[in-house]
């Protein structure tokens, strides 16, 4: 069968294409109206040390450089800021969209090809850049009909501090595995007693941000962790003043799935929708042997389509082939999708219904089917 040529995780899409196109335009237009410059990166790149384990690699000859199909656009945009845009004035505000491909799907996201949309602010140290990106993400999701949004806040700073403490432990990998499972009791059974308090304090910061923010004080064990606690509270305070209705969940025991995040990171979820609908955070970009701070977010169209309550449809109308240009332009201006009839019969309700039209033009009058 012809359908057998499509691998698992890929598909022909004939039902959601119109909605996807409208959502993408809505989000990108919103980015641009907020001063983000639209860029485009290639689907293929040469392999390098940053190539992920879930990257789709293209088989090549021994004497040829290995090629990858991109599985994430964020780092491509970061590279672009170091090359083509390196002479431009900082900070850069860039946005993008494009297809990405994964070697393997997951239980929460079995799709292996999907449209990625995102925005990045590169070279801005102020916490206000984080607030702007959070608001940009939240508003973008709202614009395409996503409701009951929950924002999860995390940071790798605290677990990194913990892993540094136990770096010589032979059970470090097992401890990481148990942290991913949120199995604190089993971790404490194999962890040296002197490290118990700090790890328990990290886990105590899991829950509603409003209820758990006071627990963050316990994590101020050095300059870096103290600075990060203040950073989280400052960003959240500013964000909540302007977006008071959103639910915010705190989880500092979450191990970062993205290797490049350097501090604060965030994930958006929607009620009754599997998996995240958007994610982002702080990361570092190298420029002229210096490290620049960047922040951004990305969302995936497959998740947006599942989460959105908005239904996009054209007002489709069946009209005679020889309709005047004036009337044709008038119908287009009014938002109709025009289907010109090339048959010999007179246009009627039955014909229009057969063509999946909601309207038809009969004797110069618009009628509903």
Predicted regions and their residues:
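Acidic, His- and aromatic-enriched active-site or binding-groove loops in soluble protein domains
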Residues: 56-62, 167-192
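Phosphate/dinucleotide-binding and metal-coordinating scaffold of catalytic cores
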Residues: 86-90
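A structural signal for short, well-ordered beta-strand segments and their strand-loop junctions
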Residues: 38-41, 94-96, 150-154, 249-251
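Positively charged, Gly/Ser-enriched RNA/tRNA-binding surfaces
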Residues: 19-34, 45-46, 74-85, 96-146, ...
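TRNA-binding/sensing appendages of the translation machinery
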Residues: 1-75, 131
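Short secondary-structure capping/turn micro-motifs that flank functional sites
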Residues: 47-48, 157-158, 179, 347-348
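Short, conserved secondary-structure transition motifs
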Residues: 153-166, 183
């Amino acid at each position: 069968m012809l359908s057998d040529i499509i691998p698992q995780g890929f598909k022909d899409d004939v039902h959601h294409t119109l909605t996807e196109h409208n959502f993408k335009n809505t989000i990108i237009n919103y980015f641009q109206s907020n001063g983000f410059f639209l860029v485009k990166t290639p689907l293929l790149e040469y392999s390098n040390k940053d190539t992920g384990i879930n990257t789709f690699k293209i088989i090549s000859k021994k004497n040829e450089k290995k090629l990858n199909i991109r599985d994430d656009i964020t780092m491509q945009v970061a590279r672009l800021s170091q090359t083509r845009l390196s002479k431009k004035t900082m900070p850069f505000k860039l946005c993008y969209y494009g297809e990405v491909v994964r070697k393997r799907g997951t239980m929460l996201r079995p799709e292996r090809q999907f449209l990625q949309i995102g925005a990045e602010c590169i070279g801005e140290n102020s916490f206000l850049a984080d607030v702007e990106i959070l608001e940009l993400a939240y508003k973008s999701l709202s614009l395409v009909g996503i409701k009951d949004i929950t924002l999860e806040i995390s940071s790798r700073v605290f677990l990194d501090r913990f892993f540094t403490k136990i770096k010589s432990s032979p059970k470090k990998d097992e401890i990481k595995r148990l942290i991913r499972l949120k199995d604190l009791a089993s971790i404490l059974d194999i962890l040296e007693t002197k490290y118990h308090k700090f790890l328990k304090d990290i886990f105590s910061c899991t829950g509603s941000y409003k209820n758990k923010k006071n627990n963050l004080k316990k994590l101020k064990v050095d300059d870096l962790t103290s600075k990060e606690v203040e950073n989280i509270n400052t960003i959240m305070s500013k964000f909540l003043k302007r977006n008071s209705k959103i639910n915010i969940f705190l989880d500092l025991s979450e191990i970062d799935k993205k290797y490049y995040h350097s501090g604060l990171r965030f994930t958006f979820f929607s009620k009754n929708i599997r998996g995240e609908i958007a994610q982002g955070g702080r990361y570092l970009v190298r420029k002229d042997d210096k490290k620049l701070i960047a922040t951004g977010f990305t969302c995936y169209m497959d998740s947006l389509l599942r989460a959105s309550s908005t239904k996009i449809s054209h007002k489709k109308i069946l009209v005679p082939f020889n309709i005047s240009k004036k009337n044709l332009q008038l119908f287009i201006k009014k938002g109709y999708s025009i289907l010109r009839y090339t048959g010999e019969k007179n246009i009627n309700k039955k014909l229009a219904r057969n063509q999946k039209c909601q309207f038809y033009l009969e004797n110069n009058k618009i009628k509903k089917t």
